[in-house]
Design a protein with these regions (language model features):
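Patatin-like phospholipase
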Residues: 1-40, 48-283
Length: 283
């Protein structure tokens, strides 16, 4: 008797997405099969490494040893991020940039970095079915990548708008998939999953909103939260109890806390253990 196909949707949320390491590790240890992995942003990074056969313990160790904020050019705080974006905008008012015509050095470096976690493989080389969600900067469309080099697809999904330039994949310029689909459970469903484990690592709404920057950040968070809620409700209508939504308790870990790998991974482990019996009963 064949079992239902199991898919996992790993959401975006910056450093909070390190929780995916813990979730995947427990599922692996407990023998829960994953037939399909779909990732957005950090979910694409961790999901890609998993699909490429990277040992999760080694992945956690390597990520913990790196200063990813510096390596990826990502600020350590929201205030610094705004300053970085403002500085780039001011600079390009006078100098311009030809990123559409010529790939920038930073883009090449980003792809090379992610090749370390994808072992230089292509989607076609993977034993586990894998898909990456990105957004087309020109059309605003969701783009689901399932072929070609893994490193470029992952880089496209994980680019931070304003910090990194859009990445060309085929004839499209792509950016962070979290803009359009933060928890891609619907993509997993479309690709054939009959049971979907959705891992939502989105940051909560800010408790205090005082500055203009706070207002902008909060508005974006509200919009993303509502879009995620609607998408998950639609998947729930199709799957019922076969949609399992995890929301790890990631207090104290912000989207920019790229040095909190192990802390986030442990929280992911704790969250998935609450649902193991439910998931196994569905198989």
């Amino acid at each position: 008797m064949s079992r239902p196909k199991v898919g996992i949707a790993l959401g975006g949320g910056g450093a909070r997405g390190y929780a995916h390491i813990g979730v995947l590790r427990v599922l692996q240890e407990e023998g829960v099969p994953l037939d399909l992995v779909v990732g957005t942003s950090m979910g694409a990074i961790i999901g890609g490494a998993y699909a490429a056969g990277i040992d999760l313990a080694k992945l956690e160790k390597v990520l913990s040893s790196l200063d990813l904020n510096r390596l990826l050019g990502i600020p350590y705080s929201t205030f610094q991020e705004v300053g970085t974006v403002a500085g780039r905008i001011a600079s390009e008012l006078f100098t311009g940039t030809d990123w559409r015509e010529r790939e920038q050095e930073g883009t090449r470096a980003l792809c090379q970095f992610f090749s370390l976690f994808s072992r230089g493989l292509k989607f076609e080389d993977l034993k586990v079915k894998f898909a990456v969600v990105a957004a087309d900067i020109d059309s605003g469309e969701e783009v689901v990548l399932r072929e070609g080099p893994l490193d470029r697809a992952i880089a496209a999904s994980a680019t931070v708008p304003g910090i990194h330039y859009p990445i060309r994949v085929g004839d499209r310029f792509l950016v962070d998939g979290g803009i359009i689909n933060r928890v891609p459970a619907d993509v997993a469903l479309r690709l054939g999953a009959e049971i979907v484990i959705a891992v939502d690592v989105s940051a909560p709404l800010a408790a205090e909103v005082t500055s203009s920057i706070d207002v902008l950040t909060q508005v974006e968070a509200i919009t993303a939260r509502e879009l995620t809620r609607v998408k998950l409700e639609r998947v729930r209508e199709r799957l019922g109890e076969r949609l399992v939504v995890l929301r790890p308790k990631l207090d104290g870990i912000s989207m920019l806390s790229l040095d909190r790998v192990s802390a986030a991974a442990r929280k992911g482990e704790r969250e998935i253990r609450k649902y193991l019996a439910q998931i196994k009963a569905l198989l």
